[in-house]
Amino acid sequence: MTTTIFQQTNHTLDAIGLRCPEPVMMVRMNIRKIASGETLLIKCDDPSTARDIPSFCRFMEHELLAKQTDTLPFLYVIKKN
């Protein structure tokens, strides 16, 4: 089995079932709790996250390391700046 970036994160947030603006609010709360340089995997199914999570990362100067939005659940990996 191949290990992917989605399997190598420090923390995980399950936001499945939440709708805008809740997923990004949860990401913000969780990012605040982790150390700089650590990673957060977000699992969600809200289509608006395809726009909102990359925008959040740009605005807050965190690094979006990976995203998978072709199938559900959508997956994002953010590295805290």
From Swiss-Prot:
GO MF entries: sulfur carrier activity
This protein's record includes keyword Cell membrane: no
SUPFAM superfamilies: SirA-like
GO biological process: tRNA wobble position uridine thiolation
Subcellular location: Cytoplasm
Active-site residue list: C20 (cysteine persulfide intermediate)
GO terms under cellular component: cytoplasm
Domain of life: Bacteria
Keywords on record: Cytoplasm
InterPro entries reported for this sequence: Sulphur_carrier_TusA, TusA-like, TusA-like_sf
Function comment: Sulfur carrier protein which probably makes part of a sulfur-relay system.
Family: Belongs to the sulfur carrier protein TusA family.
Name of the protein in its database record: Sulfur carrier protein TusA
Species per Swiss-Prot/TrEMBL record: Colwellia psychrerythraea (strain 34H / ATCC BAA-681)
Classification lineage: Bacteria, Pseudomonadati, Pseudomonadota, Gammaproteobacteria, Alteromonadales
